[in-house]
Amino acid sequence: MSDLENFRVEVKDWLDKNCPSTMRAGAPADTPIDEVWGGRKAVYKNPDSKLWLDRMGEKGWTMPTVPKEYGGGGLNKEEVKILNEEMFAIGARAPLLSFGIWMLAPVLLEYGNEAQKREHLPKIIKGEIRWCQGYSEPGSGSDLASLATKAEDMGDHFLVNGQKVWTSYADKADWIFALVRTGPKEPKHNGISFLL
């Protein structure tokens, strides 16, 4: 058997033992369906939702390509394909969807320093912290080059002044990542920073 064939057997076995029946195709129609955004404010009507998130997060499979040192699964593309195929085969629902997974984690992996990666990636992967994005502003909408929220570097922190709007799920988020203007004298498409 090849390594990938062995991995497929391992995934099937793990899913069989760890994916609750209410998180699979064929679950009773009256099974409560929870949001899968995670975070400290999450409320789970179905305890299996939290159990499934915890198990997948512990395995690192909510972000399977992230290196294990940051809490991810450390899988390669072929292994992720197998994981997705086997989850699809049993109709397993995604244990976690979030701005942290879609938008923040890739930025941290590419541009974050080591401390930021170690602090935030494991919490994103396990669904412990929920993030929202702070991009849109009154009068600018999706024209991010025209944003006016300013951030002044105070040495050990930034002082942020401005307003963000249309921030989906801000009321349920634990943290925000935002685009802010740190170079006010630069052309409007420059001088923008990404703050946590």
How does the language model describe each region?
Residues G127-Y135, L179:
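A short, Trp-centered hydrophobic/proline-enriched beta-strand micro-motif
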Residues S140-D143, F158:
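Hydrophobic, small-residue-rich alpha-helical packing segments that form membrane-like cores
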Residues M1-S98, A115-K126:
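Amphipathic, small/basic residue-rich leader segments at the start of a protein or domain
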Residues A148, H157, N161-L196:
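A short core secondary-structure module
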Residues L96-A115, G141:
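N-terminal glycine-rich flavin-associated loop
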Residues E69, S136-S140, V165-W166:
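Short, solvent-exposed loop/turn elements at beta->coil junctions and helix N-caps
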Residues N84, A105-L108, L121, L196:
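Conserved protein kinase catalytic domain
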